[in-house]
């Protein structure tokens, strides 16, 4: 975790789960929480592909795009724009 991330709010998976619609879409990916609501209408793939992961731990979807292909480095840079916090570690 870098210095900037250390100052971000920490969310539980239950809090992420409250944001599960096209108008309120949060995802947890690799221990970080992203509010992807503004990006939903701009997603280049089918909207439904992204929406099924709203409100969830979505690392698997990020890594495979649901069909075995990783996201591009451009997508990884774009994702950082939507970072809002970190996911609480479960011990």
From Swiss-Prot:
Domain Cytochrome b5 heme-binding, first and last residues per copy: 8-88
GO CC terms: intracellular membrane-bounded organelle; membrane
Gene Ontology molecular-function annotations: heme binding; metal ion binding
SMART domains, per the entry: Cyt-b5
S-S bonds: 25-54
Membrane-crossing residue ranges in chain numbering: none
Cited InterPro entries: Cyt_B5-like_heme/steroid-bd, Cyt_B5-like_heme/steroid_sf, Cytochrome_b5
Binding residue positions for heme: 43, 71
Keywords annotated in UniProt: Disulfide bond, Electron transport, Heme, Iron, Metal-binding, Transport
Record's keyword annotation contains Protease: no
Domain of life per record: Bacteria
Family of this protein: Belongs to the cytochrome b5 family.
Protein name listed in UniProt: Soluble cytochrome b558
Organism for this UniProt entry: Ectothiorhodospira shaposhnikovii
């Amino acid at each position: 975790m870098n210095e900037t991330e250390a100052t971000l709010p920490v969310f539980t998976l239950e809090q992420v789960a409250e944001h599960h619609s096209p108008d309120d879409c949060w995802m947890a990916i690799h221990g970080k929480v992203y509010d992807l609501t503004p990006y939903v209408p701009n997603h280049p793939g089918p909207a439904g592909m992204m929406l099924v992961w709203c409100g969830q731990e979505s690392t698997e979807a990020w890594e495979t795009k649901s069909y075995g292909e990783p996201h591009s480095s451009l997508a990884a840079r774009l994702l950082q724009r939507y970072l809002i916090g970190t996911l609480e570690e479960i011990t």
